[in-house]
Amino acid sequence: MAINDNRFINMNNKKQDNMISSEIRYKKTEKGMMITEYYGNDSYVVLPDEIEGEPVTILGDYAFSRNLSVEEIWMPLELKEVGRYAFYRCRNLRKLVLGNRLLDMGGGALTGCHLEEVEIYLQDGKKSCLKSIVEEMRYQMRIYLHAPEGGQEAKLLFPEHYEEAVENTPARILETHHHGAGGYYRQCFYDRELDYRKYDEMFYHTVAEDTEETAVELALNRLRFPAELSDKNRQGYEEYLKKHMTAVAKWTVKQEEVEGIRFLQRRKIWTEQSLQAGMDFAAEGSKTEILSIFMDIRKDQFPKKKKTFEL
């Protein structure tokens, strides 16, 4: 899917019309303007791209530390450095939006956070700070990579992973048990770039170690936004979905994923049985719009045969 420059225009528009946060402290450095502190209590924070005509390139140490109000932060597009413990114990921070001139996060920047979403606008090549973000977060994360005109956007899922210390009494040792496939996905980077081929090759770990819902979401994301997706891996994702269409129906209803439902319609992947399952899930959840869509697809793809009578 080609992405035009409107995405960057839209990002900048969000930083206009009095949406830019003014409750900041800053100072001028040799590397550009540094935001040293955000002292507001808004849940949605948009940081300025420029201060006094100079680009904001640094977010200082502890800039958002212990802020329990902030839930979403739009970072300066020219940002190149994030200091140590910048978001320390921002327990309610769920989403970051940033450009890719930032290649690393300072030590402990996300300690005590529970990030769920990250959007990165790829302005210069494919390198970004994504690796340092997902390595610091053990929770499941949804990632959106927006490319400039002519590129492909990606919508990715990084599953959860965690370690558990289990006592081996006979051997008198503690063994480390790993849970979830997320650890494998967090190793799919080379020189700060995501290796899509390696990412796709980890899918069997998701199938074996994570929930069916997680595997469905990951596979559908890769099919809908196929950045650097090989034919072999495309086929693998599609075959998985075809074998788990009831779970697909349940997930699309739960997420109200209309575009995902339509995508599977265009690919002729829905079966009559899975459409009926989707209708049942939608009816149970009182999601009338989704129910109507499933009914229309079934009517279109599996029309009832008219009965004929012979005299």
Language-model features, listed with the residues they occupy:
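Extended amphipathic alpha-helical coiled-coil/heptad-repeat regions
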Residues: 282, 294-309
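Ankyrin repeat A-helix N-terminal signature
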Residues: 251-257, 281-287
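Repeat-mediated protein-protein interaction surfaces in helical alpha-solenoids
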Residues: 219-237, 259-264
